[in-house]
UniProtKB/Swiss-Prot annotation:
Compartments, record wording: Cell membrane
GO CC annotation, single: plasma membrane
Function in brief: Catalyzes the formation of CDP-2,3-bis-(O-geranylgeranyl)-sn-glycerol (CDP-archaeol) from 2,3-bis-(O-geranylgeranyl)-sn-glycerol 1-phosphate (DGGGP) and CTP. This reaction is the third ether-bond-formation step in the biosynthesis of archaeal membrane lipids.
E.C. code: 2.7.7.67
Name of the protein in question: CDP-archaeol synthase
Ranges that cross the membrane: 4-24, 51-71, 80-100, 104-124, 139-158
Family the entry assigns: Belongs to the CDP-archaeol synthase family.
Organism this protein belongs to: Pyrococcus furiosus (strain ATCC 43587 / DSM 3638 / JCM 8422 / Vc1)
Membrane topology: Multi-pass membrane protein
Pathway listed: Membrane lipid metabolism; glycerophospholipid metabolism
Recorded name of the encoding gene: carS
Primary location class: membrane
Organism domain of life: Archaea
Keywords: Cell membrane, Lipid biosynthesis, Lipid metabolism, Magnesium, Membrane, Phospholipid biosynthesis, Phospholipid metabolism, Transferase, Transmembrane, Transmembrane helix
Cofactor(s) this protein requires: Mg(2+)
Length: 167
């Protein structure tokens, strides 16, 4: 597989996991409405259990479907593990970003350049690293193009009325 395609094929579960809570979310907040020592919400109402578990499921399923379509990994079980870890890492990275944004007193949905685009990506790569990784050049490519993809998908989600703001 060409290195550019390999990079995107590898990270696709994280991309899907990160974007699907916009559609699947709602319900009980992950922080259960609790506040941190600074009196601000830990994550906020926009980070919900349904969105987190939905994103984890979608990201993992995307990886399994990818493995069926094009066997990239030596086994389906490895594809499942890597996809699960990429999805989990993306969602945890997004939660960390929300936590930081709340500490900076930024409202939910407010853009934080770099944090929104790279936080989920770096966390996903770190979570999956013990099981499988990609070459450094492909990681660098993803660091460059992910902000553009993130911006484009946010604009699309806004136009589809899945998001109230285009960022």
């Amino acid at each position: 597989m060409h290195p550019i395609l390999e990079a995107f094929w590898y990270i696709l579960p994280a991309y899907f996991a990160n974007s699907s809570p916009v559609i699947l979310g709602g319900g009980t907040p992950i922080d259960f409405g609790k506040t941190w020592r600074d009196g601000r919400r830990i994550f906020g109402d926009s980070k919900t259990w349904r969105g987190f578990l939905g994103g984890l499921t979608v990201g993992t399923l995307i990886g399994v479907i990818q493995q069926i379509i094009y066997p990239y990994y030596p086994s389906l079980s490895l594809a499942f593990k890597v996809s699960f870890l990429l999805a989990l890492g993306a969602l945890v990275g997004d939660l960390i970003g929300s936590f930081i944004k709340r500490r900076l007193n930024l409202p939910p949905g407010y853009p934080a350049v770099g944090l929104d685009q790279w936080g989920f990506l770096i966390s996903a790569l770190c979570f999956a690293y013990p099981v499988h990784t990609i070459p450094t050049g492909e990681v660098l490519l993803l660091l460059v193009v992910t902000p553009l993809i993130h911006w484009g998908t946010n604009v699309l989600a806004y136009k589809m009325k899945w998001k109230s703001v285009p960022w």
